[in-house]
């Protein structure tokens, strides 16, 4: 999973070893205003069937429609696709066959800067050397020991943020952009 915070909005991208993807664009409801940056056809809540979203673990009857995040609810655009995104998966093993030891799988992602237009929040695109963005990188695995699904699903993340809900942008790690070549 990759979540990119844009202040008043954030995007979610998920993929699996088969290359199946899931993408959503979230806009905080307090930021969705007539004449605002998100008041465009791409984010028309009626034409695009936007859903109300409270958070990953706010699905109990008590919080489902109101959420528990201090900022409130988000509009979730499930039909949104990150502009120009490229992705590929490679499996070194046999998917869903526990009789064959796997070596692993890899994924390669390319998020074009121009596709981050609504996530830039006034920041330069591409970012300048030293700019800081909040981006969550995580991996979740559905395990079924003895045929029973383990919940919550085990997770590996770039930076631990002490809550299981990945929809808290203020907990995403700080990523500093750099013009330096890696390894130098």
Say what each PLM segment does.
Residues 1-184:
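Structural preference for beta-rich elements and adjacent junctions enriched in aromatics
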């Amino acid at each position: 999973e990759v979540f990119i915070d844009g202040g008043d909005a954030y995007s979610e991208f998920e993929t699996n070893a088969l290359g199946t993807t899931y993408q959503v664009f979230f806009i905080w409801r307090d930021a969705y205003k007539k004449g605002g940056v998100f008041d465009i056809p791409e984010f028309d809540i009626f034409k695009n069937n936007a859903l109300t979203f409270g958070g990953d673990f706010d699905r109990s009857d008590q919080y489902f429609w109101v959420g528990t995040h201090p900022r409130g609810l988000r509009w979730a655009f499930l039909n949104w696709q990150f502009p120009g995104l490229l992705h590929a998966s490679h499996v070194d093993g046999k998917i869903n066959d526990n009789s064959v030891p796997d070596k692993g799988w890899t994924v390669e992602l390319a998020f074009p800067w121009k596709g981050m237009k609504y996530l830039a929040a006034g920041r330069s695109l591409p970012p300048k050397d030293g700019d800081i963005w909040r981006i969550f990188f995580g991996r979740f695995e559905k395990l079924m020991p003895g045929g029973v699904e383990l919940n919550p699903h085990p997770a590996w993340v770039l930076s631990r943020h002490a809550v299981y809900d990945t929809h808290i942008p203020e907990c995403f790690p700080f990523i500093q952009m750099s013009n330096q070549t890696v390894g130098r």
